């Protein structure tokens, strides 16, 4: 029995990161031992290589503006560990986490002794989320974001009302597969019998895989790019604006506060999701709530301005496609500015290609490391770069010194490469 939050959290972090046996067997056993909390909630399930967090934020915000109470389970965290489980965007308390772990611990330890093996850290956190929304704090809807992939992700015991797949890109290829088709197959593993699926995936080969899986499960399928048009796109000083035509209606001058050309697509996909919820009488989201929700939606670490002198932006782009979209946005928004990039990445990411894309927008790059088991060495990143104006340090505190050196220079500082890295730097900046 834990009385201290830090002890409860340490117990979670002390668990295995990956299961000895892949699959959903342990999660299904945990759910059964807990009285099947996954069957007691009204949920939506969101998967995809990039755009998951922003799409969750958009859908949550629209539902909130329509008067609903919305829970979310997301990962990784950017500001606090507790934000993984939130209600209306507010993280649960230390006391609630401790109570959840105390209820979970005996079931986990009993499962340790079975043929299913030890539940992992992420499985336990996911089970805590199901338990929280089923018993501790009942809400109108819960949005679950997958952690990795889809088919065998621990969130995939959910019985959703709607499934969303944001995008398919090259990430976690050592686990999900080497081709776009293989990765799409893993993401499409969240499609359930008869449950509607909406997607913003663009690649024809990936769409074919998702469409086939939807047909196999008799799941109504809608593709953003098949049936909808985004037009009149414009970058605003503090967000994006676009118009959007679906099979149902035309939305003129939609605005978001999240910055980036890719956020228009995430917002459009969220509108498509809202249309489904309205059409199926699952929720009622008025046009006013939809528009207001998209403007009010916020998500930390997505081209987030965290300091003004000098301007410092944090962005969690952590794979090739994410960095490509980031570079595209920076070119569009800051064409006449000098940009200094601070970069770090995990060892298993294609950081050489990520660096190449950032070199197209950077005046200078400072390479850093951070305290994480899979973090790259700053020197390795430095050696992979061909830009002439570059520096490196293994000490994350030197990032703060690098930023301070830019005061009065009219340069923009962009910190990117890993969600874990920007979370670490965010704390140091505060």
Swiss-Prot record:
- Taking the record's annotation, the residue ranges forming a coiled coil are none
Q: In which pathway does it act?
A: Cofactor biosynthesis; tetrahydrofolate biosynthesis; 7,8-dihydrofolate from 2-amino-4-hydroxy-6-hydroxymethyl-7,8-dihydropteridine diphosphate and 4-aminobenzoate: step 2/2; Cofactor biosynthesis; tetrahydrofolylpolyglutamate biosynthesis
Entries under InterPro entries matching the protein: Folylpolyglutamate_synth (IPR001645), Folylpolyglutamate_synth_CS (IPR018109), Mur-like_cat_sf (IPR036565), Mur_ligase_C (IPR004101), Mur_ligase_C_dom_sf (IPR036615), Mur_ligase_cen (IPR013221)
**Which cellular component, as a GO term, is one annotated location?**
cytoplasm
Detail which positions bind Mg(2+) 2: 172
Q: What is this protein called?
A: Dihydrofolate synthase/folylpolyglutamate synthase
Q: Name one Pfam family in it.
A: Mur_ligase_M
